[in-house]
Amino acid sequence: MNSKDCVVIGIAGASASGKSLIAKTIYEELCRDLGTDQIGVIAEDAYYRDQGHLSMDQRVLTNYDHPKALDHELLCSHLRELKAGNAVDIPVYSYTEHTRTDEKVTLTPKKVIILEGILLLTDPALRKEMDASVFMDTPLDICFMRRLSRDVAERGRTMQSVMSQYTETVRPMFLQFIEPSKQYADIIVPRGGKNRIATDILKARIQHLLA
């Protein structure tokens, strides 16, 4: 499989901005068009660095909204391997243990790879691997309310810990790294993951790249 046979789409934006929703929508609709074995989704979160050598007290102090928390080098390597026609083993990250598990998820080469993550557009090397990129431009207050509900319900977090993390790292890192990366996006999507027009534009772009 040559690189031109694999289209990589990056979907970035603040935490809880609608990235996963639009990625899921694109995935499901392209699966109907191309087949389920031709589309893959990679979450940037899977590439948080392994912290198994640290105590839990040390792990919770990590700034997970800083680019250094992520192993983008491994992600870039995996994208290049997929483009070359090789399968890759993607790490599995535990939000409750704040480190990688011993498990891996094998991903085989696909026609379309959808990346989604908060810091994708901050890395020049990652941007070079993308054929098109999207930034979810959702107001921060809406993102915060969604994140609060999600992290308490799904990730074993307390309300106080989510609020503290937001004020100490999430919001400052968004302003320092994530929002400035919007300039590198090909498509800026307002109103979250349910923006049907933006979804159709992105699908059309993918189909054009595959033609």
From Swiss-Prot:
Keywords from the UniProt entry: ATP-binding, Cytoplasm, Kinase, Nucleotide-binding, Transferase
State the pathway, as annotated in the record: Pyrimidine metabolism; CTP biosynthesis via salvage pathway; CTP from cytidine: step 1/3; Pyrimidine metabolism; UMP biosynthesis via salvage pathway; UMP from uridine: step 1/1
The residues listed in the UniProt record as binding ATP, with positions renumbered to this chain, are: 13-20
> What subcellular compartments does it reside in?
Cytoplasm
Gene Ontology biological process terms, A to Z = CTP salvage; UMP salvage
Q: Which GO terms describe its molecular function?
A: ATP binding; cytidine kinase activity; uridine kinase activity
* Any one Gene Ontology cellular component term annotated for this protein: cytoplasm
Q: What is its EC number?
A: 2.7.1.48
**Which catalysed reactions does the entry list for this protein?**
uridine + ATP = UMP + ADP + H(+); cytidine + ATP = CMP + ADP + H(+)
HAMAP family tied to this protein = Uridine_kinase (MF_00551)
What family does this belong to? Belongs to the uridine kinase family.
Name of the protein in its database record: Uridine kinase
Organism equals: Shewanella pealeana (strain ATCC 700345 / ANG-SQ1)
